[in-house]
């Protein structure tokens, strides 16, 4: 299973360094959840504010969405990745806890 990352610029073309930073940061989400299949990064600029939205799709039809706005696009990217890390870790814990039952206790 390969990870596909799509990056879209809206209203402005961002420099390659910003695009590389975004791809590098979101790629780290696979550390927390290895079932990530697709990541869509949307970089936007309206007026003086940058907006970054990241949509992560994983196995079992799981979707995670993070959004941030700031004057600095790099700060936006970092904030979005932090939000998504929390979402992904929480979802993984929920899946892990769901599979952990009272199996041995029920038999006794």
Q: Where do the protein language model's features map onto the residues?
A:
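N-terminal, polar/charged subdomain of small-to-medium soluble alpha/beta proteins
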Residues: 1-108
């Amino acid at each position: 299973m390969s990870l596909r990352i799509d990056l879209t610029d809206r209203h402005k073309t961002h420099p390659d360094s910003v695009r590389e930073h975004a791809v590098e940061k979101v790629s780290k989400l696979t550390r927390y959840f290895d079932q990530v299949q697709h990541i869509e990064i949307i970089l936007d600029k309206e007026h003086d504010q940058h907006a970054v939205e990241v949509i992560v799709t994983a196995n079992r039809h799981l979707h995670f969405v993070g959004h941030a706005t700031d004057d600095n696009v790099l700060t936006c990217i970092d904030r979005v990745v932090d939000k998504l890390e929390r979402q992904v870790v929480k979802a993984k814990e929920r899946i892990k806890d769901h599979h952990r039952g009272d199996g041995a206790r029920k038999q006794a």
